[in-house]
Amino acid sequence: MSDIVSSSTDYSRRSPSSSSIGTNETDHTGFHEKRQGASSESLIPPAQRSSEESMPAPKLFPKLTSKPNPQLNLKDTLNKRVSDRLQALELNKSFDFSGTPRPMHPISHPLSQHKTPEFKHRKRNVESILTPKNPSLFSSSNAASQRGSLNTAPSNFAYSHSSSLQTSASSRPPVLSNGSFPRQTNTAPLNPPVHLKDNIRNSATPSTSQADIPTQYPINSTQKQQAKYEAEIEGYKAKLAGTYHEISVLQNTIVNVSGQLIAVNDQLQQLRSGKASTSPSTKDTNMRLVEGHNEETLALQRGKYTQEEVDKLIQERMEKVAEDLHAQYSAKHTQKINAFKANYARKYEATIQELQNQIGTAPNAPKISNSNWEEERRALKADNQTLQKQLEKAIQERQDMSDFLNNFKADMAKSDKLLMQQQSQQTGDLETLRLQLQALQEELRVEREERQQLIQMSEDLVIAMDQLNLEQKS
């Protein structure tokens, strides 16, 4: 965006010839806008006029004053308004730039990104992007209606408004005062002279006057940082508001849960009073519920609940209600089981009686004669006796093996005891031998010292004798 503002500054510092051309173009533009404002109703069809009246005017530039508003994000506002203006221009198809068709493509990305080819071969000026070069395109009625529907829309600058684009006060953007811009009262014909057309076509100046150039306002890093901090503050405020909302919702939930608990307690008291006889578990549950209600009453008298107290009370109440429901459902379950038993007893009573009668009449039935039955019985008896003998033999062998194992264990215990005694005795003998060995080593050391002393004495004696011999000879 800073490139666009700087380009507009470069445009204002051009040669005198370009400034004179801009003055002539300003005269032509002012006359054209006056002429178009007067005849826009006759040029625009009724259907198009109604749609244009209902369509809000595109906004191009924000209101920039000498003292900037710190809460206004200028960059985002300029990007949004430029995109809106480009989309509005795209609705009116493409314009003819110097006889060559040149379609206008809407820019969906912000202007702060990489520069498109549109910025490479044209002056980087906001109006050079949004308006065509050739003002002679608006000589026809259709072009006049298009210019009347777009360029005469209210913006931040003092344009003459046509009667076909009357909008409500709420949808109009703020308009600067007309004192800083000269009012054009030129009554030239609609088509400018030929030399003006050539100058405008050959020059790189746009078809708008200097009044159309936005007010220059550089955006420095301090303002960007301030806008960033303000955005963060707004985010924190939103989070704080959300936290307050959650707190209020939780407080309402606590109140609702407390009311539900009190209602459940009242229902339990009504059930207790309406029931003639209750079980001991139900009585204990009701007593606990009454105690819990008393605790709640004391807590209410003491002050508000804390979150831990609320969780504790809810847990206790849920446990009490669960125990009470378990007792009630257990009683109902037992009653159902007894009813099922009685029902099945009645259902199968005839079958049971019939089976009992059959069992009673079975001994009176005639015996079935079988010629091989006696032989099979004798064979089975013989097999039984054989198996009995084998079993007794196996039992005896097992007993013998058990006795052998017991004797072996006893012998092993005795052997272990003797081995331990021998080991302890050998340990004592080894200790004695070790002591004797130490004594012998000590004696040996003493003898070695004595022998060393004797050897030393003998050597001294030999030396003394040699000296005596030498003295005698001398």
Swiss-Prot record:
Signal peptide residue numbers: none
A molecular function GO annotation: microtubule binding
Ranges of Basic and acidic residues composition bias in the record: 25-36
Biased composition (Polar residues): 66-76, 177-189, 201-223
InterPro entries the UniProt entry points to: TACC_fungi
Comp. bias regions, Low complexity: 1-20
Pfam family, one: Fungal_TACC
Subcellular location: Nucleus; Cytoplasm; Cytoplasm, Cytoskeleton, Spindle; Chromosome, Centromere, Kinetochore
Residue positions where Phosphoserine is found in the record: 17
Keywords from the named record: Centromere, Chromosome, Coiled coil, Cytoplasm, Cytoskeleton, Kinetochore, Microtubule, Nucleus, Phosphoprotein
Cellular-component GO terms for this entry: cytoplasm; cytoplasmic microtubule; cytoplasmic microtubule bundle; cytoplasmic microtubule plus-end; equatorial microtubule organizing center; kinetochore; microtubule minus-end; mitotic spindle
A single GO BP: mitotic spindle formation (spindle phase one)
Coiled coil: 219-273, 367-471
Region (Disordered): 1-79, 93-114, 164-223
Main location: nucleus
Subunit annotation: Interacts with alp14.
Function: Required for bipolar spindle formation and proper chromosome segregation. Has an indirect role in connecting the kinetochores and the plus end of pole to chromosome microtubules by targeting alp14 to the spindle pole body. Involved in the emergence of large microtubule organizing centers (MTOC) in interphase cells. Attaches to the minus ends of microtubules and associates with the sites of microtubule attachment on the nuclear envelope. This leads to the stabilization of the microtubule bundles.
Protein name, per record: Microtubule protein alp7
Protein's organism: Schizosaccharomyces pombe (strain 972 / ATCC 24843) (Fission yeast)
